[in-house]
Each structure stands twice: as C-alpha cells, then as structure tokens.
Amino acid sequence: DEVRISIAHTCTDYDTAKAAFAAGASHMTHLYNAMPGITHREPGPIIAALEDGAEVELITDNVHIHPAMVRFTFNTFGADRVILIADSMMACGLPDGQYSLGGQAVTVRGPRATLTEQPGTIAGSATCLFDCMKRAVLDMGVPLESAVRAATLNPARSIGIDADYGSLDAGRYGNVVLVDDKLDILKVVRHGEVIG
C-alpha cells in the first residue's frame, strides 16, 4: 500500500518544507490556511510546494481564500496540481445556527463556520464540494474546465483511484453531475444510474 505524505497547518519554514518534499511529501493540505504567507525574505512552505511539484488543496468557499489568491494558485501551480476541497463540517447543507466540531461550539452563517468563543477563527466550512467548484468558476474567475478537473480527476489521481474515477474515459464509472449554464444541478448520475 502506498502512503502519501502531506504538509498541513504548519509553521514550517521554506528549508524545512523543502526537506520534507525531498523526503517524500508530495501534497499540501489547505494551502494558505494556518501557514506562513509568502514574503521576499521568508518564502515559506508555499514556495517550497510550488518548486517541488506538490499537489495543493484549495478551499474555495468564498471564506477561506481571497479570489485573487485562488486565481494566482491555478496560474502558478497549474490546473493539474490543484485539488478543490470543501473542508465541510457537520453543518454542511443545514440551516444557520449553532453546531459542534471536535467538542467546540461553532456558529454557522451561510458558508462561514467560526468558533463561537472566537468569532474570527474559521472552523471548517459549511459548503459542499460542488458549491466550492461553482464558486471557483462564478465568483473567482477560474475556468470551468480547470475547476472541474480540480474537483474530480486531480483528487482521484492524488489518492490513486483515477483508473476508476475522476473522468469519463472508457472503463471508468459513469459518475456525472449535469448542470445548466448557471452551474445549477439538473441531474446526478452515479455508476451510470440517475439518482437525482
């Protein structure tokens, strides 16, 4: 069984991140979140990931990352290295209100989930992956083809299931979300069967 190593929620510096990638890390979880930013004197783990070919995850819920940084990431890392994720907590799809995450009280308003005791601290997301993909296209200016790839093929490849999932190539499972021109869902097909 293959193990994939990811750098996540880290205070590491550039050199330490480079050493981690040289030792086999190949992925960066929740890019930009809870990690040092990029500066000209301290490039940090983000530049190490860029240089070493790492796959990077983006939470495109209109809360975690500014749209300009999302576009920057697609443009610099390339659409084949970006993986869209939702980082959803249990409140995803539920009404605004009070929820719990790991024993901590969380307040949800729209896509924003914050610690109730620390309202400025993000506590996951209340947005599903499809809506993150939709937001990336409609609100952040990511090309549709790039956003779909980042939500389907790239994550499947990252965990080694792209022989069966992630695209509509021959021999793969027929999983499809049919949308209209506003990216609203019309139908969902799972393993070739319409389920919604």
Q: What are these model-derived regions, one by one?
A:
Residues 1-96:
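Active-site core of metal-dependent hydrolases
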Residues 182-189:
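Short, Lys/Arg- and Gly-enriched loop/turn segments at beta-strand edges
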Residues 10-13, 99, 103-106, 183:
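C-terminal intrinsically disordered extensions
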Residues 45-58, 62, 74-172, 176-178:
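His/Asp/Glu-enriched, well-ordered alpha-helical/loop segment
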